[in-house]
């Protein structure tokens, strides 16, 4: 019996009245699958890995924090946060701090 779980993630950015779209100039960079056999490495864990990678890239590029959301599904990509196992939204500081 396999205990592996596939966690599929996607990073989206707001796109005005059209809603959300895949993040960045290379959206495939921010879409993928993490396979884990450790029950502690759940959807929230995968989202934390992706957020850490995003923030590291922003620092490397000297870019400001951006408004994005990280969506994680179990086994297969869904349509949005409504069918996700976990979703976190990052919003930039609007007060400049």
Whereabouts are the PLM-identified features?
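Short aromatic-glycine-(Arg/Gly/Cys) micro-motifs in beta-strand/loop hairpins
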Residues: 2-28
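A short, exposed loop/beta-hairpin motif centered on an aromatic-Gly-Thr core
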Residues: 21-41
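Mixed-charge, low-complexity intrinsically disordered regions enriched for alternating acidic
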Residues: 38, 43, 63-67
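Short amphipathic, charge-patterned alpha-helical segments
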Residues: 42-54
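Short, mixed-charge low-complexity intrinsically disordered segments
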Residues: 52-97
């Amino acid at each position: 019996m396999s205990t592996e779980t596939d966690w599929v993630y996607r990073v989206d950015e707001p796109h005005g009245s059209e809603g959300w779209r895949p993040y960045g100039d290379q959206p495939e960079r921010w879409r993928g699958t993490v396979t884990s056999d450790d029950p502690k490495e759940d959807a929230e864990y995968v989202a934390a890995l992706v957020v850490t990678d995003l923030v590291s890239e922003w620092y490397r590029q000297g870019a400001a924090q951006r408004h994005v959301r990280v969506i994680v599904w179990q086994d297969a990509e869904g349509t949005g946060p409504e069918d996700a196992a976990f979703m976190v939204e990052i919003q930039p500081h609007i007060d400049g701090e």
